[in-house]
Amino acid sequence: MKKTNAMRLLDAAGVKYEEFEYDASLGISGTDVARTLNEDVNMVFKTLVTETNKGEHFVFIVPVAMELDLKKAAKAAGAKKVDMLKQRDLLPLTGYVHGGCSPIGMKTKLKTFIDASAMDKEYIYVSGGKVGLQIKLSPAYLVKLTDATAIDIVKSAVLQ
C-alpha cells in the first residue's frame, strides 16, 4: 500500500499504529466504516473541519455515532459561532477529501480538539488520509501529534 501523508508523519514520529483498508463501496459513513472494521462505533472517530464567521478554521475529532455540538465547539475555539466547512473547501485547506480527511498531516496546521471520551480508550480509529483507509492508534499519541485539546464537544448519540 502506498503511504499517505498521515502514515508518513506517524512513521517519522515513531508512533505505533495499524492501518486497515476497507471497501469504500460498502459506504463511507462512520457507522459503515465501524461495521466494516467489526468495531464498536465508539472506537471509530470522524474528523470534522469548521469555519468561523472570521474565516478561522478548527478541527474536531468525535466518535462517529455522536454529533458535534456546534455551541460547545465555538466555545472551545473561542469563537462566537462555528459552522461546518463547505465540502468544496476541504481539499484546498486540508489536502484531504471528504470521507478521507485525517486529523494527521493536514496541509494547513489547524487548532484541533478531540472529544474527551477518546482519552479513556486504549486505541481509536481515525481516517488514514484517503477514502478506504483507517488508522488504529493510541489517542494519547494522536493528541501529542496533532497538539489537540481533549474536551467535551459532542451533543448526543445520533446513530447506532
Predicted regions and their residues:
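Extended, low-hydrophobicity, polar/charged segments
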Residues: 1-160
